[in-house]
Amino acid sequence: MAIALYMDVHIPQAVTEQLRRRGVDVLTAIEDGATEVPDDELLERATQLGRVLFTQDIRFRAMAQDWQHQERLFAGLIFGHQLGGTIGQFVKDLELIALASDSDEWRNAVEYIPF
């Protein structure tokens, strides 16, 4: 019943490390060799892997909304505003999301954190 997360290249490593300590399945774009991949390809890659993308890049939010209007499938997007939360808040919210939801709930969904 848990979801897997895919971290955009700009997410602090501390978020990934703390989530892994809590048992959350996390893959970073860096680990996946996707550090210089265009945004649309990164969202597509996360979708191919069945992972919800977490980003702080506002361009992803607009792109995901465009994909929703086009009915183009993606695995889900979680947007964390850079000035809107601390690492601890992001970890807490992402852990809750990852462990309490499933991939079907996230299909073509966009969510904003911190809550």
Language-model segments: residues:
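Acidic, PIN/NYN-like endoribonuclease modules and their adjacent C-terminal/linker elements
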Residues: 2-9, 13, 17-21, 34, ...
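Short, surface-exposed connector motifs at secondary-structure boundaries
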Residues: 1, 24-25, 48
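Conserved BB-loop
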Residues: 25-37
